[in-house]
């Protein structure tokens, strides 16, 4: 038996809901395994429209957004590079990396590079002069790269909106270190698009703030914390001084300004209760 995760986009934090699916693994047949995964999903929900987002997908729109096919434009090499290649080439290990030379290599050669498995523990990612952590959100860098690529190439992203679930047969728990999970990244993108939040993809920090940071609940009054801080405090009303105790003006001909009691009478306003 094997387990894969099905990812469902949602139009609000955290933009993706995950559901593990168990199925019988058939060795050496990715497409049969994909069919088994989808059949397992449809046994509980036959109306789910699911897309496999890997190079083994039978659906052209799914193959087009696999990490081996989906491209990200990098100014540093002045070309479009497969997401899987960017992800591997930017890894920084204890004893090596990043391996910028891999950015211009074909994906099969990249994944066979022994440096990716013999350089010690993965510490972080480094891309075009910027550093990205592996903790506390170990999948966030891959997901951000994937979403950036979809935003750069909207013709690849548009067909995804027709699906409400995604799978990635390559994204087993023991292989995520090397491949990432395209199904989760695709679901997050669709969720962000539905919520009108694609602008958060423009920077890694904004992406983390939107996708990985749970929104604070509003106060019970319904006002946000910021709005509450902006509301000025109301001072206690000043004690009213009797009219006969008010200081008299030096100029007897000066205009007399009515006090509060007189103003109420003049304007015929009801007194506050």
Residues covered by each model-derived region:
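A short mid-domain helix/strand-loop element embedded in enzyme catalytic domains
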Residues: 147-170, 182-184
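Active-site nucleophilic cysteine motif
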Residues: 175-189
């Amino acid at each position: 038996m094997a387990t894969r995760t099905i990812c469902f986009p949602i139009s609000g934090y955290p933009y993706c809901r995950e559901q593990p699916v168990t199925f019988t693994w058939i060795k050496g047949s990715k497409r049969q395994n994909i069919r088994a995964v989808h059949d397992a999903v449809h046994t509980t929900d036959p109306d789910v429209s699911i897309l496999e987002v890997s190079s083994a997908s039978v659906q052209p729109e799914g193959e087009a957004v696999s990490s081996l096919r989906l491209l990200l434009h990098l100014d540093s090499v002045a070309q479009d590079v497969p997401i899987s290649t960017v992800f591997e080439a930017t890894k920084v290990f204890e004893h090596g990396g990043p391996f910028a030379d891999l950015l211009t290599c074909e994906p099969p050669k990249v994944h066979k590079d022994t440096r990716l498995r013999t350089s010690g523990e993965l510490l972080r990612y480094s891309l075009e002069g910027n550093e990205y952590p592996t903790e506390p959100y170990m999948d966030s860098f891959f997901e951000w790269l994937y979403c950036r690529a979809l935003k750069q190439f909207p013709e690849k992203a548009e067909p995804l909106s027709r699906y409400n679930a995604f799978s990635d047969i390559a994204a087993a728990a023991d292989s995520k270190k090397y491949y990432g999970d395209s199904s989760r990244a695709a679901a997050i993108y669709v969720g962000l698009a539905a919520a009108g939040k694609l602008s958060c993809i423009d920077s890694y920090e904004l992406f983390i703030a939107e996708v990985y940071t749970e929104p604070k609940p509003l106060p019970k009054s319904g006002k946000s914390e910021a709005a509450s801080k902006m509301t000025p405090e109301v001072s206690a009303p000043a004690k009213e001084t009797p009219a006969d105790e008010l200081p008299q003006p030096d100029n007897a001909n000066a205009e007399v300004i009515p006090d509060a009691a007189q103003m109420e009478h003049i304007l015929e306003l009801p007194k506050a209760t």
